[in-house]
Amino acid sequence: MNIESIGTWAGEVYKALENQDTRMLGMKALKKATKLKKDELMAALGWLGREGKIVLTEDDEDLIVALV
């Protein structure tokens, strides 16, 4: 895992969210849409969160990721 890889994964996550009408997905759906491993997805979310591009909320069953 390196900075370039994390940036690439963050781009994949951003595109997956951007392609949704609601601009949000649950973690399970996001993992399926990007085909990233759990640690790759978490690193990408950390990257996007640090840049202020996403917001995370919880519902009863899943963590919801949404573009700002």
Regions found by a protein language model. Name each.
Residues 49-59:
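A short, conserved structural fragment
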Residues 36-47:
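Short amphipathic alpha-helical interaction segments
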Residues 18, 46-49:
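Short amphipathic alpha-helical segments enriched in leucine
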Residues 6-34:
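Short amphipathic alpha-helical interface segments
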Residues 28, 42, 59-60:
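Short loop/turn and capping residues at structural boundaries
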Residues 1-2, 38-40, 56:
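Intrinsically disordered, low-complexity regions enriched in Ser/Pro/Gly/Gln/His and often acidic
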Residues 25, 34, 55, 63-68:
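Long, charged, low-complexity, helical-prone intrinsically disordered regions
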Residues 1-14, 62-63, 68:
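Short alpha-helical segments that sit at the start of domains
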